[in-house]
């Protein structure tokens, strides 16, 4: 079958009224507060995605955010569509909840004050050798780091010590980890005792994910923490070591809650954490937005700590040569077929078939940093969707965030939106 490749959708996008009777302006995304640092975030291209939604006359159908990640699409269009926000990583549905589900009770509690009772008691029990002074020699600083990391082998009797045990001296200090555990303990207690509902719990957890991100000494993700090898590097790491988790948490909590109460309307949104194939098998006729993590590295390697905070399940950690790997990776972290060269084609075919089976339309984000050539991808789309669909794409320049601390913090990429519309 001859490939149907149309590189320009400008004529479709210039139409003042779509076939569904909706003007293009109705697909403009709302402004929203971001909560975590996330590589490849689509927050900068929401207008571009809105044009794609207009081109398929999306109004009146659910919007399925199939690989929601940090939830840029979910957040940007959650006031205009019923959103099905899906990602196999559970932290994504927690963030999505903050943009989609009303948290009516969480503002009644001072979470920091409640957590301080727990945190201050546990911090007082830390040996003096674990505290970070404002200034230090490189050798002394690394001794403190090693002392913090020694908590990995300690036996704890408290109910909430996951971060203190696993992550002290890595991306966070022991003191910061104690605060993370304490806030999580308060949220668990309020939820289990019925003082807050699930949406409130998720809101608080989202703010804690934010506090984690902005007190971490890493580069914006959790692949590996930095070692202090130079005086300059030590000074930068120590700046983050001495940053207050409760201060960052409370600041974000107040700002985010003000936005949340003003803008969030529950349009019968759905939050799911499923394999993309399972999710597609459950949907009705929709518009599916897909931004799969097709790169040579697995995103779970970068965001496993967030998944662990959300699941709070004291995971088994990966070992190498009888030692826990530096990244503190979970043994069960997700491995995406889109990140495996031998599986990526089949993964896309499965996605196309799932969209076709539900008679949905597809908006697929593609960037030229991916593992598969765009012509090859469009060929797969045409062969899978067949004559019952029209397939085309549009391009734009986009700055992709790499999360490097100094060099190559971002790079220019060509972002494409591949569109498959049922005829």
Write out the residue ranges for each language-model feature.
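Class I S-adenosyl-L-methionine
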Residues: 374-378, 385-423
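S-adenosyl-L-methionine
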Residues: 2-64, 72-80, 95
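Conserved S-adenosyl-L-methionine
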Residues: 59-113, 297-311
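Conserved phosphoryl-transfer catalytic core
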Residues: 96-169
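Conserved Class I SAM-dependent methyltransferase catalytic core
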Residues: 333-386, 395
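SAM-dependent methyltransferase catalytic-core segment centered on the flexible catalytic loop
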Residues: 295-358
């Amino acid at each position: 079958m001859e490939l149907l490749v149309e590189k320009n959708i400008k004529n479709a996008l210039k139409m003042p009224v779509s076939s569904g009777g909706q003007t293009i302006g109705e697909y403009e995304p709302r402004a929203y507060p971001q909560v975590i640092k996330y590589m490849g975030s689509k927050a900068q291209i929401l207008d571009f995605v809105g044009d794609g939604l207009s081109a398929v006359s999306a109004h009146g159908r659910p919007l399925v955010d199939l690989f929601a990640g940090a939830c840029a699409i979910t957040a940007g269009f959650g006031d205009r569509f019923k959103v099905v926000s899906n990602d196999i990583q559970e932290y994504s549905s927690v963030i999505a909840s903050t943009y989609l589900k009303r948290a009516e009770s969480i503002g009644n509690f001072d979470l920091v004050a409640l957590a301080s009772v727990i945190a201050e008691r546990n911090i007082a029990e830390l040996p003096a050798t674990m505290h970070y002074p404002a200034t230090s020699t490189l050798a002394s600083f690394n001794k403190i780091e090693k002392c913090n990391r020694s908590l990995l082998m300690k036996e704890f009797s408290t109910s909430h010590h996951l971060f203190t045990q696993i992550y002290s001296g890595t991306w966070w200090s022991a003191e910061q980890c104690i605060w993370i555990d304490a806030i999580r303990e308060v949220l668990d207690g309020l939820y289990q005792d019925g003082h807050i509902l699930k949406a409130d719990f998720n809101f608080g957890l989202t703010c804690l994910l934010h506090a984690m991100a902005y007190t971490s000494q890493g580069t914006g993700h959790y692949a590996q923490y930095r070692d202090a090898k130079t005086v300059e590097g030590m000074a930068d790491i120590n700046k983050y070591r001495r940053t207050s988790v409760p201060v960052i948490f409370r600041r974000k909590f107040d700002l985010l809650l003000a936005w949340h109460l003003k803008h969030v309307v529950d349009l019968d949104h759905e939050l799911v954490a499923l394999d993309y194939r399972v999710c597609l098998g459950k949907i009705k006729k929709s518009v599916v937005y897909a931004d799969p993590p097709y790169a040579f590295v697995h995103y779970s390697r970068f965001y496993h700590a967030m998944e662990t905070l959300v699941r709070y399940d004291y995971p088994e950690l990966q070992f190498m040569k009888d030692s826990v790997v530096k990244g503190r990776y979970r043994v069960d972290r997700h491995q995406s077929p889109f990140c495996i060269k031998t599986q990526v084609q089949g993964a896309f075919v499965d996605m196309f078939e799932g969209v076709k089976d539900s008679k949905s339309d597809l908006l697929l984000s593609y960037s030229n940093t991916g593992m598969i050539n765009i012509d090859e991808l469009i060929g797969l789309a045409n062969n899978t969707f067949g004559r019952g669909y029209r397939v085309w794409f549009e391009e734009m320049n986009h700055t992709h965030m790499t999360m490097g601390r100094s060099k190559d913090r971002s790079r220019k990429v060509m972002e494409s939106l591949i569109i498959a519309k049922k005829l």
